Amino acid sequence: MSFIHKLIQKFKPKKKLVDQVQQAVQEKSFFQANQKSYYQGLNKSANSFANTINKLAANYVTVNEQFQESLFEELVLLDIGYHAATKICDAIVQELKLQRVSDPQLIQEIIVDKLIVYYIQDKLFETDLTVEANKTNVYLFVGVNGVGKTTSLAKLADQLTKQNKRVLMVAGDTFRAGAVAQLAEWAQRIGCDIVLPNPKEETPAVIFRGVQQGIQNEYDFVLCDTSGRLQNKTNLMNELKKIYQIVQKVSSAKPQETLLVLDGTTGQSGLAQAKVFNEFTELTGIILTKMDSSSKGGIILAIKDLFNLPVKLIGFGETTADLAAFDLEQYVLGLTKNLSLNHEPNQT
């Protein structure tokens, strides 16, 4: 059993009786993390992380002020964020001093240990997508332009359809040129039903029709695309609030998921987006895309630290299989695979 696996197991809750809803969730294989995707998709982040940690472990035999400054700088560069980096750095230095550690591998293990403990903070996040049994589940996809919002929706629709679920896509991005055609093409490729906007119809009206149709025809899932909006445009953000209220009115409940799609390569800009979107609507989770192109895997810690929001899905590439459920253990294994920790054999 690997060092990482042992560490994660300490925080896993004891198994409870599985009720109908939990069982429905567990039966859906699209919620499972793909270990191979994590190992291959996190190559850039893993190389960056290993270079950072190996350099620190090799350059400092004693834990002094210079070590602490270097550690803090490296954590910030990994996009962990100033607040989280400060707390994690203090915890690492305290532990290293307490144990009087000078062995480079032990230094690596303590750094990884404190990163995981900080993310978990006494309990594991619920990262499964919410699925209510015997009900139409409505998912809203929100975010700025260019983050992979429409593509992520289509990839999830494909995975759900392959599980024999009835899925209705709603092409609510009426602003971006080509967005409707893009989703319509995906629908044809997947074999999935879609609600398209009428001429000059705005996003809230399209979402209203789509959710209404999904409920009336007893679809399992209604996946709603929305127009990309800049977080500094108040009128667009207010429209998002209106869309959220429309779903509540039509379905007599909040959307099962309101997912903010973030580009994993944008770093602190993504955090600024999350802050504003979270103010205008009740986000339930994050979809982190383009992680195969990112060298800064620490953004997941920053999201957890600032907003207490779970990353629910993570994207590593172009195919539909490259959108995976977020799994902390697989993520950490992928991120630390180039360190000399006690890993299980690498997946290639």
Swiss-Prot record:
Localization per record: Cell membrane; Cytoplasm
Major subcellular location class: membrane
InterPro entries: AAA+_ATPase, P-loop_NTPase, Signal_recog_particl_SRP54_hlx, SR_rcpt_FtsY, SRP/SRP_N, SRP54_GTPase_dom, SRP54_N_sf
The reaction(s) this protein catalyses: GTP + H2O = GDP + phosphate + H(+)
A molecular function (GO) term: GTPase activity
Residues involved in GTP binding: 143-150, 225-229, 289-292
Highest rank taxon of the organism: Bacteria
Organism listed in the record: Mycoplasma pneumoniae (strain ATCC 29342 / M129 / Subtype 1) (Mycoplasmoides pneumoniae)
GO biological process: one example: SRP-dependent cotranslational protein targeting to membrane
One Pfam family named in its UniProt record: SRP54
SUPFAM superfamilies noted in UniProt: Domain of the SRP/SRP receptor G-proteins, P-loop containing nucleoside triphosphate hydrolases
Function: Involved in targeting and insertion of nascent membrane proteins into the cytoplasmic membrane. Acts as a receptor for the complex formed by the signal recognition particle (SRP) and the ribosome-nascent chain (RNC).
Sorted UniProt keywords: Cell membrane, Cytoplasm, GTP-binding, Hydrolase, Membrane, Nucleotide-binding, Receptor
NCBIfam families associated with the record: ftsY
Protein name (record): Signal recognition particle receptor FtsY
Gene that produces this protein: ftsY
Stored SMART domains: AAA (SM00382), SRP54 (SM00962), SRP54_N (SM00963)
Membrane topology: Peripheral membrane protein
One GO location term (cellular component): cytoplasm
Disulfide bonds: none
Subunit structure: Part of the signal recognition particle protein translocation system, which is composed of SRP and FtsY.
Family (UniProt): Belongs to the GTP-binding SRP family. FtsY subfamily.
